[in-house]
């Protein structure tokens, strides 16, 4: 009642006022003025002064406007109200305390810096003032009890009225101060991030996230709908992040844990920002036992006159505590996840930046990818315990103190059990880190071979390795699962420890207390003591569980941080060259080497020795040598990628264009690959395109140069890949198109033109590298590793390497010919005349098309979670889930029911002390022991049985989907996206999903059990439980519509990030050559910034859910207390206490449910992606393709195409058109044509890698469209263009993957291909395959050895010899002739000189079969093949041999005629009787001559004819042969035992090709 108290009752500290004022339910005015007025005002004065000093120098960001004016106008009446209060307080006779004047003066003084700060903050900050907002908010709450107290004191009616008026004005000021200033901001400072605008109240209540939630609930979200983030959560644009700077200052980077200090220093203020809300959270949580005790005591003594007033205040206290828990928990967690997001941005950027500077030959792609995915995610996952670790220690200490007050020495039991759990958890954590590393290493090995398979899918299918690789990768997955089970067994122990404390602590403590207590009312275990202790035990269990889990998670995070530290601490790449980027003269050489020894690292044996050479500016230098002699190493030395052990290499240019041996493309359009980030210059672009022979390809492609080439160019032919990808600007192997367009003056080509057809090769060489090519016109310096030795006359300088790694000879072509006679066999004396209209290509108009657009957002983002759950559940039989849920239900009952048991026990003690004590204790122990047993049984059954099965099945489904996908899928899908499913998605499914499912089920079952206990204990609340459940369902449904999309978008946003990272790792040498590292860093930061948006916003909406559900619990508690107070006289105190104890537990369970559910839904996003991928990816296997071929299939070796037309994607646009031909057993057939003519497509149809729209392909008379595709590929031996080497596998596994042959046969085969000497010095067949083990040509020989060991009678070479030197090519051709003499051979090739002795040639153009005849037949008449052959390096040799043979035949005829004339002159001397013997002797003489000349003389018997020479016959004979074909009897097999023409040609060709070697 107003005016019922005197000032004397308030003029002391109190804090509680006497019973005369509200029955003692109030604080004293003295206490309130000290803590609710003076302390806030003094704090504001100090904080506002400091803030004004800091912000006054900031730039003006916001205009004044009405908001600024109104705030200052309202501040004036507020200041006046404080002056009026001071005036009234200072009047004599006005009741006041000793602190009243000081309090009022400080409140008035606080308005001065407050006003100035409002002015500064409005103009110089985008956000509302945090200091002003917090002060106004807190003092508004404090003014409520102050106004109430002043109102009750006699003689202060006017003061109270003024005070209330000032409070109202303060409320208006708070509204204005928190008002956003978005429309008043100057344009140059406008920020799209909503958190840059929102004030502290908005952010604490998460109002800023509501627009995103409403939009996500209504429609599908796109990337444009996502909020932008503050700059602090994005990677630093310059890469100078705070973590980087602190890391650079670390002296001992090899020390374990060295990464922790830089992170702590970099984010110290962000970490400290979460301390205060976490302390508030702890304070509010610890307040719950006091509320329970006060409530139980209130209802025990409900008949007191002040009970109703106390009950009302108690409801307010519940509102304050549970509302505070909701806001403080959400705020503390939000601050934590902000730090996690910042840490992720910094670490990913650091790993990427380090990857640009690492040594290329040491670069482990799988290890770096694992750091980017698994380790980063594990660190961020464990980062949520940043504040929980230290806060749990504080909470545990307070809880133990309160338990000691309740149970005396029995309160010691929890600390003993807790200590045991903690020590055990620490030991487990130490073991967990080691086992986790073993698991991650297993993941790394599986991901590495999966990435390799995805990057070589065409070769995998052609080689028939699909099933083998599926089994191998699945076996690695099973090994990985076994490794994970060792780690998961420790997780089970951690879960057991977390719940062991919950089960056993109250049992032990209550047993000790009950056994030692007497029968006095203040000693027994009564309701108030028992229920308060139960509340404390529940909280203590939560604190211990959090501490134990945080210790384990922190240990795992530290292990991952150490792995990142090891990577960052690696020695960076050091350029051993002397690079001079300053201007130079025309006479300054581009590259100089002086007695250089080259090796991979210091201390190793050198690979190249005593190199001295000089690459002149604007010259063409060609490097030649035998396979494995070090040509590629020499080029890498010029690039600075290989160490110069001795000597000096000087480079007078800062950028080089490098083109490696393998065609390498980014997943972008053709134009993007050529431009590489350079501005688009249409005339120059068209000129470059024409020079590289791409204009025809553009016209044949529907989208022109906007066609997406796919990962590694799988959608292009081998030749198209080489001409596009080998000059790729962005990521893959660079080649001429990119190099020319980029303007780099020095180009290094490592056998970049291999694999092109002769016409295209001639075109590119002439237009780019020829005497009048673009390189000459643009004054470029070109260094070219080549096997096309017929090009040597064009070189300004030649470097020939010896097999021992030294320079055999160098100089001009003429110099080399003089110094080494056999080099003359490499090329003709003069370059051939090149039939071109113009040496400088005419610019062409490039086809334009709509730009390639990404696929729209998948419907899977909004798909039903029910389907995802069902998909996951169906991975194991249903009875396993029934057993699991049954075990879980029993355990939850054994954990929840003991609280009811203790309540019954306490109620008995209230009525009769220590009644049935032994029985109560015994049953209590039974519940605890059984609960522990069922917990372990539940965890073991799920983690070791169900999880292992689901992991295996999901990976098997995913892998089977990928290996069965058609080639069109790999052409249109980025390999990084697919690999993301095997790394990121499976990581979530393996690491986070199992524990999330276990803990979510546990929390859900506990929530249900606690709600049942609450309903039974407080009967009137039962009616509100359905409403509460309904509210939960509505909130959950509303939340899930957005979070489901965000979690999918978060995973999808990582795919381009990983793709960019893979491109960096694969093209590291190229990127460094072009000095494009910075460009890639910027792209990574842009992709990382985009990835951060869904990542952070998902956390934000999860915190929104946490806040809303905690607020719902607060509302539920208030309803419960309201009903209890309304029915106070009919409510049992112990039953209400039991309900409140379970409310406390329910609050913890809801928090656990939220935390675990958010992890679960994030993990389920990965399951959704796998499910959608498996269901939406088309399989190449058709329904009718189920038959298996007979065991002797391909034994006849016949292949027949009948009217075959085939397509890639669109049946209306066939790429093969009406092909018909038949190949007989043992026949050698070559397939030729220009690049893109359909050669590889023809054999792809045989391997069923493209679809037939009409016609049939038969092998041994069986239509292959009825057979399983893998069976076809396993039966037909295939060698793809790119050698397939399974890195990480042994040589034996690579050479004999099907394990057909014994070791001896494998070794003999390796000896035949010349590779055993390399392996014998290592580990033999057990040598682990690695990139640096073999050169490109040696890898192809290894694949040839694999083909030699395969079973089958049909072998297909798909440009298998395109990238090897002539000697290796000759070796492979000899192996084909000897080892596959009885096989049917189909060879796709551009090297036409190697197939002259084939039985037949198929000439392709634009998918049409133009010609099909023996090669000599086609050469003998005008034909497309003849024109192609004219452009090959064998044409001049062919013509020379033909002329030589024709001349030999002419001389033989002349000799024959002369002999005949001599014979006719002697006939008169020979009698008829002797004539037959003479003729016989002459025949024998000519047979000997015939053998000496290789069987080229017709087997004709000399007969009598006139002495006059038959010149007409000689002319006819010469004409018969001049076409390039011999039609006499002796042209085929070499006559009577003589050497055949093929053998002669092969012998001569081999001698020419082996010149240097």
Curated annotation (Swiss-Prot):
Its main location: membrane. It is found in: Cell membrane. InterPro entries: AAA+_ATPase (IPR003593), ABC1_TM_dom (IPR011527), ABC1_TM_sf (IPR036640), ABC_transporter-like_ATP-bd (IPR003439), ABC_transporter-like_CS (IPR017871), ABC_transporter_C-like (IPR050173), ABCC_6TM_D1 (IPR044746), ABCC_6TM_D2 (IPR044726). One of its GO terms (biological process) is transmembrane transport. GO terms for cellular component: fungal-type vacuole; membrane; plasma membrane. The chain crosses the membrane at residues 27-47, 70-90, 99-119, 131-151, 159-179, 256-276, 311-331, 385-405, 412-432, 490-510, 531-551, 882-902, 921-941, 996-1016, 1020-1040, 1105-1125, 1135-1155. Disruption phenotype: Does not alter the yield of aspercryptin significantly. Residues 1507-1522 have a biased composition (Basic and acidic residues). Induction: Expression is positively regulated by the aspercryptin cluser-specific transcription factor atnN. Residues 279-556, 882-1162 form the ABC transmembrane type-1 domain. Residues 593-829, 1199-1431 form the ABC transporter domain. Disulfide bonds: none annotated. ATP binds at residues 625-632, 1233-1240. Keywords: ATP-binding, Cell membrane, Glycoprotein, Membrane, Nucleotide-binding, Repeat, Transmembrane, Transmembrane helix, Transport. The keyword Transferase does not apply. PROSITE patterns: ABC_TM1F, ABC_TRANSPORTER_1, ABC_TRANSPORTER_2. Glycans are attached at residues 202, 249, 667, 916, 1132, 1203, 1218. It is a multi-pass membrane protein. It comes from the Eukaryota. GO terms for molecular function: ABC-type transporter activity; ATP binding; ATP hydrolysis activity; ATPase-coupled transmembrane transporter activity. Residues 1439-1464, 1503-1557 are annotated as: Disordered. Belongs to the ABC transporter superfamily. ABCC family. Conjugate transporter (TC 3.A.1.208) subfamily. ABC transporter; part of the gene cluster that mediates the biosynthesis of aspercryptins, linear lipopeptides built from six amino acids including 2 highly unusual and nonproteogenic amino acids, 2-amino-octanoic acid (2aoa) and 2-amino-dodecanol (2adol). This is ABC transporter atnG. It comes from Emericella nidulans (strain FGSC A4 / ATCC 38163 / CBS 112.46 / NRRL 194 / M139) (Aspergillus nidulans).
């Amino acid at each position: 009642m107003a005016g019922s108290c005197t000032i004397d009752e308030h003029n002391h500290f109190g804090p509680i006022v006497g019973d005369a004022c509200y029955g003692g339910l109030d604080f004293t005015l003295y206490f309130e003025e000290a803590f609710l007025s003076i302390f806030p005002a003094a704090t504001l004065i100090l904080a506002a002064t400091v803030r004004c000093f800091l912000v006054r120098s900031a730039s003006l960001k916001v205009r004044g406007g009405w908001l600024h004016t109104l705030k200052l106008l309202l501040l004036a009446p507020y200041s006046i109200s404080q002056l009026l209060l001071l005036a009234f307080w200072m009047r004599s006779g006005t009741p006041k305390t000793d602190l009243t004047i000081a309090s009022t003066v400080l409140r008035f003084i606080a308005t001065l810096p407050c006003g100035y700060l409002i002015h500064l903050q409005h103009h110089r900050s985008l956000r509302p003032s945090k200091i002003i907002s917090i002060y106004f908010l807190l003092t508004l709450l404090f003014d409520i009890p102050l106004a109430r107290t002043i109102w009750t004191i006699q003689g202060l009616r006017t003061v109270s009225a003024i005070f209330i008026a000032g409070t109202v004005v303060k409320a208006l000021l708070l509204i204005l101060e928190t008002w956003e200033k978005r429309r008043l901001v100057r344009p140059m400072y406008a920020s799209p991030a909503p958190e840059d605008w929102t004030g502290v109240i908005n952010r604490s209540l998460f109002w800023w996230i509501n627009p995103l939630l409403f939009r996500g609930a209504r429609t599908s979200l796109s990337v444009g709908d996502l909020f932008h983030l503050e700059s602090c959560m994005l990677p630093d644009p310059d890469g100078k992040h705070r973590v980087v700077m602190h890391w650079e200052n670390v002296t001992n980077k090899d020390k374990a844990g060295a990464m922790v200090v830089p992170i702590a220093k970099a984010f110290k203020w962000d970490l400290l920002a979460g301390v205060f809300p976490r302390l508030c959270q702890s304070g509010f949580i610890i307040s719950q036992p006091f509320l329970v005790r006060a409530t139980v005591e209130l209802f025990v003594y409900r008949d007191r006159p002040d009970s109703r007033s106390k009950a009302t205040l108690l409801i307010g206290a519940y509102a304050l505590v549970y509302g505070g828990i909701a806001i403080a928990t959400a705020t503390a967690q939000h601050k934590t996840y902000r730090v996690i997001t910042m840490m992720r941005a910094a670490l990913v950027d650091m790993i990427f930046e380090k990857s640009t500077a690492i040594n290329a030959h040491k670069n482990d792609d799988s290890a770096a990818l694992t750091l980017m995915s698994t380790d980063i995610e594990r660190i961020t996952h464990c980062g949520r315990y940043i504040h929980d670790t230290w806060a749990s220690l504080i909470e545990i200490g307070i809880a133990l103190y309160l338990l000691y007050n309740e149970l005396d020495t029995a309160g010691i039991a929890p600390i003993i059990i807790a200590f045991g759990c903690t020590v055990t958890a620490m030991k487990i954590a130490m073991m967990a880190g080691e086992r986790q590393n073993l698991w991650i290493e297993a993941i790394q090995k599986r991901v590495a071979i999966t990435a390799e398979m995805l990057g070589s899918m065409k070769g995998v299918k052609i080689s028939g390795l699909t099933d083998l690789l599926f089994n191998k990768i699945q076996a690695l997955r099973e090994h990985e699962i076994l490794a994970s089970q060792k780690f998961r067994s420790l997780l089970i122990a951690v879960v057991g420890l977390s719940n062991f404390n919950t089960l056993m602590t109250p049992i032990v403590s209550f047993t000790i207390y009950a056994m030692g207590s007497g029968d006095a009312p203040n000693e027994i275990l009564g309701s108030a003591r028992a229920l308060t202790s139960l509340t404390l035990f529940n909280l203590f269990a939560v604190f211990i569980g959090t501490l134990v889990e945080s210790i384990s998670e922190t240990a795992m995070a530290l292990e991952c941080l150490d792995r990142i530290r090891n990577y960052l601490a690696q020695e960076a790449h050091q350029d051993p060259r002397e690079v001079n980027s300053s201007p130079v003269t025309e006479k300054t050489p581009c590259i100089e080497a002086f007695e250089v020894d080259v090796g991979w690292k210091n201390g190793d044996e050198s690979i190249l020795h005593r190199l001295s050479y000089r690459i002149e500016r604007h010259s063409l230098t060609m490097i030649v040598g035998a396979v494995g002699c070090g040509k590629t190493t020499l080029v890498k030395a010029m690039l600075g990628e290989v160490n110069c052990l001795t000597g000096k290499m000087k480079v007078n240019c800062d950028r080089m264009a490098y083109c490696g041996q393998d065609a390498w493309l980014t997943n972008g359009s053709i134009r993007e690959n050529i431009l590489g980030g350079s501005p688009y210059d249409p005339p120059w672009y068209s000129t470059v395109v024409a020079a590289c022979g791409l204009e025809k390809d553009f016209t044949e492609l529907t989208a022109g140069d906007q066609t997406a080439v796919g990962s590694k160019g799988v959608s292009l032919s081998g030749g198209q890949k080489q001409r596009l990808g080998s000059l790729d600007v962005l990521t893959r192997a660079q080649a001429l198109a990119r190099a020319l367009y980029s303007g780099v003056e020095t180009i290094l080509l490592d056998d970049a033109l291999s694999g092109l057809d002769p016409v295209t090769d001639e075109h590119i060489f002439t237009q780019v590298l020829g005497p009048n090519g673009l390189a000459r016109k643009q004054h470029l310096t070109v260094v070219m590793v080549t096997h096309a030795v017929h090009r040597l006359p064009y070189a300004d300088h030649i470097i020939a390497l010896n097999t021992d790694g030294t320079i055999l000879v160098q100089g001009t072509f003429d110099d080399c010919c003089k110094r080494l006679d056999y080099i003359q066999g490499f090329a003709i004396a003069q370059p051939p005349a090149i039939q071109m209209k113009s040496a400088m290509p005419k610019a062409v108009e490039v086809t334009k098309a709509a730009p390639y657009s990404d696929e729209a957002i998948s419907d899977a983002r909004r798909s039903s979670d029910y389907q995802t759950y069902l998909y996951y559940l169906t991975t194991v039989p249903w009875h396993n889930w029934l057993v699991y849920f049954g075990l879980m239900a029993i355990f939850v009952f054994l954990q929840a029911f003991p609280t009811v048991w203790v309540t019954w026990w306490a109620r008995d003690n209230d009525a009769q002390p220590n009644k049935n004590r032994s029985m109560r204790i015994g049953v209590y122990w039974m519940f605890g022991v059984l609960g522990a047993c069922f917990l372990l049984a539940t965890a073991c059954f799920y983690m070791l049985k169900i999880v292992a099965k689901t992991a295996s099945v999901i990976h098997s489904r995913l892998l089977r989907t990928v290996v069965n996908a058609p080639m069109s899928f790999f052409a249109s899908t980025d390999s990084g996206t697919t690999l993301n499913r095997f790394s990121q998605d499976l990581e979530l499914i393996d690491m986070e999903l199992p524990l999330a499912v276990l803990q979510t089920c546990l929390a859900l079952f506990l929530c249900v059990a606690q709600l049942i206990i609450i309903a039974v204990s407080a009967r009137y609340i039962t009616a509100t439980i359905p409403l509460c459940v309904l509210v939960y369902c509505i909130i959950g449904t509303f939340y899930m519509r957005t979070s489901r999309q965000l979690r999918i978008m978060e995973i999808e946003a990582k795919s381009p990030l990983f793709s960019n990272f893979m491109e960096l790792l694969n093209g590291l040498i190229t990127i460094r050559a072009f000095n494009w590292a910075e460009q890639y860093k910027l792209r990574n930061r842009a992709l990382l910034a985009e990835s951060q948006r869904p990542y952070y916003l998902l956390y934000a909406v999860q915190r929104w859910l946490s806040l809303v559900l905690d607020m719902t619990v607060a509302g539920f508690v208030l309803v419960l207390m309201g009903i209890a107070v309304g029915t106070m006289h009919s409510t049992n105190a112990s039953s209400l206490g039991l309900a409140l104890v379970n409310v406390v537990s329910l609050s913890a369970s809801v928090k656990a449910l939220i935390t675990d559910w958010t992890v679960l839904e994030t993990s389920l996003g990965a399951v959704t992606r796998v499910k959608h991928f498996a269901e939406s990816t088309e399989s190449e296997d058709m329904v009718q393709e189920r038959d298996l071929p007979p065991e002797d299939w391909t034994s006849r070796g016949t292949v027949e195409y009948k009217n075959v037309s085939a397509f890639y994607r669109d049946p209306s646009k066939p790429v093969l058109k009406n092909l018909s031909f038949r190949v007989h057993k043992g026949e050698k057939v070559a397939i030729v044509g220009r690049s893109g003519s359909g050669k590889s497509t023809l054999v792809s149809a045989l391997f069923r890698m493209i679809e037939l729209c009409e016609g049939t392909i038969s092998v041994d008379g069986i239509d292959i469209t009825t057979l399983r595709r893998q069976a076809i590929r396993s039966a037909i031996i295939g060698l793809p263009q790119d050698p397939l080497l399974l890195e990480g596998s042994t040589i034996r596994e690579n050479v004999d993957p099907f394990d057909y042959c014994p070791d001896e046969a494998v070794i003999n085969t390796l000896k035949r291909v010349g590779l055993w000497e390399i392996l014998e010095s290592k580990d033999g067949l057990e040598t682990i395959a690695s990139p640096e083990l073999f050169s490109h040509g040696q890898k192809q020989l290894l694949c040839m050895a694999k083909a030699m060991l395969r079973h089958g009678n049909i072998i297909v070479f798909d440009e298998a010899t395109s990238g090897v030197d002539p000697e290796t090519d000759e070796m492979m051709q000899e192996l084909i002739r000897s080892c596959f003499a009885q096989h049917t051979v189909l060879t796709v090739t551009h090297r036409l000189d190697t197939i002259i002795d084939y039985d037949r040639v198929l000439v392709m153009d634009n998918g049409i079969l133009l010609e099909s005849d023996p090669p000599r037949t086609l050469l003998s008449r005008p034909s497309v093949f003849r024109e192609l052959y004219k452009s090959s390096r064998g044409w001049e040799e062919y013509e020379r041999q033909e002329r030589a043979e024709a001349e030999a035949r002419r001389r033989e005829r002349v000799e024959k005629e002369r002999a005949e004339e001599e014979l006719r002159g002697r006939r008169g001397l020979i009698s008829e009787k002797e004539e037959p013997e003479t003729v016989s002797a002459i025949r024998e003489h000519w047979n000997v001559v015939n053998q000496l000349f290789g069987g080229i003389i017709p087997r004709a018997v000399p007969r009598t004819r006139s002495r006059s020479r038959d010149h007409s016959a000689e002319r006819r004979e010469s004409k018969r042969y001049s076409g390039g074909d011999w039609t006499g009897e002796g042209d085929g097999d070499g006559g009577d035992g003589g050497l055949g023409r093929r053998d002669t040609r092969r012998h001569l060709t081999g001698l020419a090709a082996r010149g240097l070697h």
